């Protein structure tokens, strides 16, 4: 048996169907670090698969039955459906087929675990918790939903007792994870295609929190009404709350922004009157990011970290890929790439942009899924108020069929109808470049938002602007 995981020390090759996915790749990387043989397939190679190959994995481009080879176990995500040739071959052979969350739970089983859940902010909060535990000497294992800049990866295998994981609520699998400390950042009606109703999602988060052991801890943001309601329903478990509100156990006070850096103090109200961490700074703007940091502070204090350690760790926070990531600056115009694709996320990111620059904010959004745009259409029409200019690209379908009334031009019309002064459609990457050349001036910020191919547009934009300007 492997002492770190309870898994047998030799399983034979573990095959991941969709190994390039951000959730799958982290598990694969940690398994390799523990000495297991890993192989996997994906539709195409990527930086993620290249990294896994450099660590010793075998990668197959494209998915076909023959890729399994001598695989002894097959790991799949919820995105892999019946009919996938590798899944069908595994079942034909009678191989164990393991869901991603089940394999993650196996890795967690012999560690003390911190699991971070919430509709928004999971990845950044996971990174912040990992950053603080690193500074505190805990040497944690980390499996995240985004690439942590300090690691150059979304995963890290540490030798310490603690494991920090992002807990994905999208398919309900987060309730399989054996969390010792459970963090809830917020709860919004998302992923209804799985949950069916908001009440079912609420129950999922209730189960996530109440599944912790009696010696565990729930860390919950009571600035969010749904999370505060959840706290009121939970009994017989220890809870620490965080937020900006006066009742929060871990509370941000005296917040101000200077040159895109958040400066604040943290009142540790659960530790008694007068307990404050003064002079905190976070090198990224946004009230939502300060809130995420409070969750990490709550965990760090629970685990015994000193105030100075916490202050120093957050001040050096390196961030996470595609979360308000600066990809370039051309002619005094800052270009940001962000994963935000839900109205709540978009509004928070644009508010952060407004706090970070003195010039104008130009938002470029690629809606992700027709179903999301359709179900949250009115929210999308009002979440861009902090942007001076809004450009909407074609919907990234993610395999969905178009829905009447939920397309690019519908959203542009909706923005204008709701009072936005400058909203327009863009057709392609060339169109984005033309827009920026036409609209952006020194001191402005261009924020590219979305979960699809918009990230490539953002990353290409600085070179395109410099190339044609030369």
From Swiss-Prot:
It catalyses: UDP-N-acetyl-alpha-D-muramate + L-alanine + ATP = UDP-N-acetyl-alpha-D-muramoyl-L-alanine + ADP + phosphate + H(+). Keywords: ATP-binding, Cell cycle, Cell division, Cell shape, Cell wall biogenesis/degradation, Cytoplasm, Ligase, Nucleotide-binding, Peptidoglycan synthesis. Cell wall formation. This is UDP-N-acetylmuramate--L-alanine ligase. InterPro entries: Mur-like_cat_sf, Mur_ligase_C, Mur_ligase_C_dom_sf, Mur_ligase_cen, Mur_ligase_N, MurCDEF_pg_biosynth, UDP-N-AcMur_Ala_ligase_MurC. The lineage of its organism: Bacteria, Pseudomonadati, Pseudomonadota, Alphaproteobacteria, Rhodobacterales. ATP binds at residues 118-124. GO terms for molecular function: ATP binding; UDP-N-acetylmuramate-L-alanine ligase activity. It holds the Pfam family Mur_ligase_M. It comes from the Bacteria. Pathway: Cell wall biogenesis; peptidoglycan biosynthesis. SUPFAM superfamilies: MurCD N-terminal domain, MurD-like peptide ligases, catalytic domain, MurD-like peptide ligases, peptide-binding domain. It is found in: Cytoplasm. GO terms for biological process: cell division; cell wall organization; peptidoglycan biosynthetic process; regulation of cell shape. The keyword Isomerase does not apply. Its EC number is 6.3.2.8. GO terms for cellular component: cytoplasm. HAMAP family: MurC (MF_00046).
